[in-house]
């Protein structure tokens, strides 16, 4: 990691600016990358709390002769947001909506507000900002403006430029100017305004270059390369000087406030999923489909379909609307105000496909047809699938990845089929292939050839492919940059694309605004070579150090048994920076700090294992701080489209740190809980005094770091007893269906099952296990309670607490005991059922990763949560439970691991078996308790803040008669402490219904 250290600048910024100033190595490493393949270490980062603080920091940098890089979500794919500069991160604090004019359909915002967050605030007014880009959950308005972003529905709404009304900007000399509509003679611009001189010079340049602009600017809707000189052509009545800043990639000024044009919310829509047996046929059909005036036409190719089928969160969506094995899909959306008109257009789409000769019963290139999608929920799921396109493509686990550099070309629709065919041939010539998706409606398809940028031959191939592709685009009068901008990737090619004369004009614009290169130098003008490997994430000296890992990473390439490859799966797309919906990433949603998001942690890990953060970085205090607020919720395992499993990676970090530094007293008490619990339970009355004896809680905080503000779980003197099996009062006459097996085959059936009694329910909430036994026995099952195979008196344990503090060897020992105890039951075809999600789902995740044995894989294949097992039996018509009505409302919180393993739906399904029970799921992220995390004095504030994101307010709003349901022991504890309500396990709800 190349560094430029300026300690004097750091001291001055800290002394004179009230914002957060961070020049440490870990922070600079986290800001060294964006969603491109580049890595350039910044000088430092400033996170201003106000616009005035941002201006002050920029002024200091100007005085010190240091450039600045305004940054939003850092989701650029072309390298716009990396530079050897001081980063001005607008995304944490500069997020206010300044003005809303509902009648005028206008809004003014600060640059750091995220698009989805803005639209959430606008929704009650029936309005939205309609540039609906795929990264809307983390892209900021400032970043979108700097990039001139386009959305899937640009056929109707255009790009960002067409929706920006004005910009208040700080100029390079420190002055402020209002960029907006102006008269051609500048009569409405005061003589004293710094804008007047700039505008006069820009108009002169526009007049001089008008003919060249007319001749050289691409004639396609999607063109965001270079500066918008076409906005300066004289004789127009709609000159808006803000449009010269739009698409300027932060190279001309700093946007302080941005005024946007709004549109009415879309109403009900229809979607036609056009299937094609041949990719070229789909490309040729696009030009005909757009004549039906859809709002969007989006491509999904066979590669993306195949990859998405391997991702749990997308598999059900594909199964719902994809027929057969199409080579390509075109998703055609109609959104007129009149519903009947949408249906008529959908009918015309069917007629068009028929007229083009496509039919379901035909083979080859003429296979095809339209699947109607009218259900809004399925439409939303398809949109989620489509917007995750890049990340789905990046889920490939090989060293080669789809690389962004020719992904943004746009060509006229009549040339689209030829262009895609010829570019495919170019890829083949250079020994690779490409994956295609995105905006067929405007001829802007995102294609990324698969390359390994660690290899010199692939870097040479990248150069050759780029030159051939861009030459082809020029031949078709298209644009080499349709929506992702220039950055480092395409700035080098602006001269051949626009011609030398306009390239010089771009330099004149830059120099007029920013003569000393204060703002993001090297983008659009005077750019480096795009294949300069010294600026790559995987530079010429990139090498992962040898390391010993504890878990199985063999599905990935690289050092540490594949740990390197797993870490490198993070492509910095920033999906983990989402602020709402799903679970990922709860710590970031509280702190808004790049350190505390999955992307930031993955970057820190990558830099550490490759020696770029200095020796011993993996076990350093800085790395411990980086991992500190990760609650191991596993949301990233499911919701990160590239499958970055930070919870599992944290285990490796904890293990390495524990091996080097040992454990604190608090960590020992947490990790060894299963070992001392049998003895502690005998002193339950004494241990429980901690919460009632004056001063005891504060003493425990001082000695072991358990917060005095948090109650501790109550030990039970009468613990759950597993000395005898439970026979069903009415044994089932029929066996259950075949269970799963690790090899995919069927095992023998059994009406007997095994209950795993976890440490938490055994010693703190035995009523849950008692209720589960009652329910299962009443349903006709013979229940075996799992006991050690060697006859030991020490109960079984999944090893979860040991893993949480990095004691992997101890966890492996517990896992081996558990697998041995359950092996004979699994071999006899019995399901293994657990109540605590983090324990039983560990059977499917960490235990196979630790033991790497066939017995562990067989156990994983037959381990179920309590609700999963009952839901499966109910769906098959085999569940026999005489449930009585409960005419109440049940508010249900899903455990993070249930959501990560798609097990939460079973919770809702089982509760709905209770007659008259009204079941409602809480749309919540992590509860924030996360085992010991919520008890620790140094993390309790973040723990409670996570709960306040959605869970605790929802519980407080619930009526006193509402049943609060939560399967996780930590979740129940958080609800108790944070909302003063008692939550219960599903097993107790069902037992109540049986009473």
Predicted regions: what is each one?
Residues 1-63, 73-105, 134, 157, ...:
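N-terminal flexible segment immediately upstream of the FAD-binding catalytic core
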Residues 395, 399-400, 475-480, 487-629, ...:
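Ferredoxin-type iron-sulfur electron-transfer modules and their immediate structural context
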Residues 514, 521, 528, 647-735, ...:
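Iron-sulfur cluster-binding electron-transfer modules in prokaryotic oxidoreductases
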């Amino acid at each position: 990691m190349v560094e430029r250290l300026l300690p004097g600048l750091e001291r001055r910024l800290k002394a004179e600016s009230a914002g957060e100033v961070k020049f440490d190595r870990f922070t600079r490493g986290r800001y060294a990358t964006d969603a491109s393949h580049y890595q350039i270490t910044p000088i430092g980062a400033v996170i201003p709390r106000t616009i005035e603080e941002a201006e002050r920091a920029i002024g200091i940098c100007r005085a010190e002769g240091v450039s600045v890089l305004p940054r939003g979500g850092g989701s650029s794919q072309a390298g716009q947001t990396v530079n050897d500069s001081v980063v001005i991160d607008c995304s944490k604090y500069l997020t206010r909506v300044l003005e809303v004019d509902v009648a005028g359909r206008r809004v003014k915002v600060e640059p750091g507000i995220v698009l989805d967050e803005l639209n959430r605030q606008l929704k009650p007014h029936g309005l939205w900002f309609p540039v609906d880009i795929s990264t809307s959950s983390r892209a900021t308005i400032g970043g979108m403006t700097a990039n001139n972003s386009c959305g899937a529905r640009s056929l109707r709404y255009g790009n960002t430029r067409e929706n920006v009304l004005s910009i208040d900007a700080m100029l390079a000399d420190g002055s402020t100017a209002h960029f907006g509509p102006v008269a051609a003679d500048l009569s409405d611009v005061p003589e004293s305004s710094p804008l007047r001189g700039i505008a006069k010079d820009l108009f002169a340049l526009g007049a001089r270059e008008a003919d060249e602009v007319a001749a050289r600017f691409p004639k396609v809707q999607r063109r965001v390369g270079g500066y918008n000189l076409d906005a300066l052509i004289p004789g127009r009545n709609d000159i808006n000087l803000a449009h010269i800043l739009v698409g300027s990639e932060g190279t001309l000024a700093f946007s302080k406030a941005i005024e946007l044009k709004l549109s009415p919310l879309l109403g009900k829509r229809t979607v036609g999923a056009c299937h094609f047996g041949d990719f070229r046929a789909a490309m040729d059909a696009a030009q005909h489909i757009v004549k039906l005036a859809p709002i969007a036409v989006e491509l999904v190719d066979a590669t993306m379909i195949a990859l998405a089928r391997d991702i749990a969160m997308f598999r059900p969506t594909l199964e719902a609307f994809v027929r057969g094995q199409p080579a390509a899909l075109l998703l055609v959306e109609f959104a007129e105000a009149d519903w009947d008109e949408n249906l008529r257009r959908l009918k015309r789409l069917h007629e068009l496909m028929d007229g083009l000769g496509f039919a379901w019963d035909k083979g080859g290139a003429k296979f095809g047809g339209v699947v109607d999608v009218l259900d809004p929920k399925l439409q939303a799921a398809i949109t989620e699938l489509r917007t995750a396109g890049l990340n789905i493509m990046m889920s490939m686990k090989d060293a080669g990845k789809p690389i962004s550099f020719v992904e943004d070309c746009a060509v006229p629709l009549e040339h689209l089929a030829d262009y895609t065919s010829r570019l495919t041939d170019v890829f083949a010539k250079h020994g690779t292939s490409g994956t295609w998706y995105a905006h067929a409606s405007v001829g802007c398809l995102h294609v990324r050839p698969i390359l390994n940028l660690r290899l010199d031959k692939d870097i040479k191939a990248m150069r050759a492919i780029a030159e051939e592709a861009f030459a082809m685009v020029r031949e078709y009068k298209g644009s080499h940059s349709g929506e992702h901008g220039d950055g480092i990737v395409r700035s080098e090619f602006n001269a051949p694309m626009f011609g030398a004369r306009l390239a010089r004009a771009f330099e004149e614009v830059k120099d007029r605004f920013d003569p000393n290169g204060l703002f993001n130098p090297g983008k659009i003008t005077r750019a480096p070579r795009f294949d300069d490997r010294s600026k790559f994430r995987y530079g010429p000296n990139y090498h992962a150090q040898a390391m010993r890992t504890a878990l199985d990473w063999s599905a990935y390439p690289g050092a540490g048994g594949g740990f390197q490859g797993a870490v490198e799966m993070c492509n910095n797309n920033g999906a983990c920076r989402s602020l709402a919906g799903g679970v990922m990433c709860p710590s970031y949603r509280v702190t808004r700090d790049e350190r505390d998001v999955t992307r930031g942690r993955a970057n820190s890990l990558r830099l550490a294992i490759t020696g770029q953060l200095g020796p011993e970085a993996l076990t350093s205090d800085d790395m411990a701080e980086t991992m500190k607020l990760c609650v191991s919720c596993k949301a990233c395992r499911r919701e990160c489209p590239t499958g970055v499993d930070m919870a599992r990676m944290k285990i490796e970090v904890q293990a390495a740190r524990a091996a080097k530094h040992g454990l604190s007293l608090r960590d020992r008490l947490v990790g060894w809980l299963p070992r001392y619990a049998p003895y502690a339970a005998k002193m339950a009355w004494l241990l429980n005094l901690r919460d009632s004896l004056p001063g005891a809680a504060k003493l425990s905080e001082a000695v072991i770091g358990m917060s005095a503000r948090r109650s501790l779980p109550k030990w039970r003197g009468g613990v759950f007893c597993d000395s005898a099996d439970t026979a069903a009062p009415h044994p089932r006459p029929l066996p259950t269906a075949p269970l799963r097996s690790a090899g995919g085959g069927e095992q023998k059936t059994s009406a007997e099952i095994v209950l795993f009694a976890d440490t938490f329910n055994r010693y703190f909430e035995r009523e849950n296990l008692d209720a589960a036994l009652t329910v299962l026995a009443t349903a006709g099952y013979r229940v075996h309670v799992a006991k050690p195979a060697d006859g030991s008196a020490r109960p079984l344990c999944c090893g979860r607490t040991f893993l949480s503090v990095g004691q992997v060897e101890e966890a492996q020992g517990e896992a081996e005991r558990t697998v041995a105890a359950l092996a004979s039951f699994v071999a006899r075809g019995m399901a293994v059922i657990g109540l605590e999600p983090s324990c039983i789902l560990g059977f499917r995740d960490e235990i196979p990763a630790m033991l790497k044995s066939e017995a562990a894989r067989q156990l994983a294949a037959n381990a179920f949560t309590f609700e999963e097992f009952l839901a499966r039996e109910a769906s098959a018509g085999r569940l026999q439970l005489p449930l009585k009505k409960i005419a109440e409302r049940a508010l249900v919180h899903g455990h993070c691991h249930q959501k990560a393993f798609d097990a939460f739906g079973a919770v809702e399904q089982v509760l709905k078996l209770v007659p008259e029970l009204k079941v409602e799921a809480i749309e919540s992220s992590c509860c924030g308790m996360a085992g010991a995390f919520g008890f620790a004095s140094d993390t309790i504030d973040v723990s409670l803040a996570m709960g306040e994101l959605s869970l605790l307010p929802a519980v407080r709003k619930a009526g006193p008669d509402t049943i609060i349901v939560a399967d996780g022991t930590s979740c129940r504890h958080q609800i108790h402490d944070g909302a003063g309500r008692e939550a219960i396990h599903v097993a107790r709800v069902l037992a109540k219904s049986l009473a």
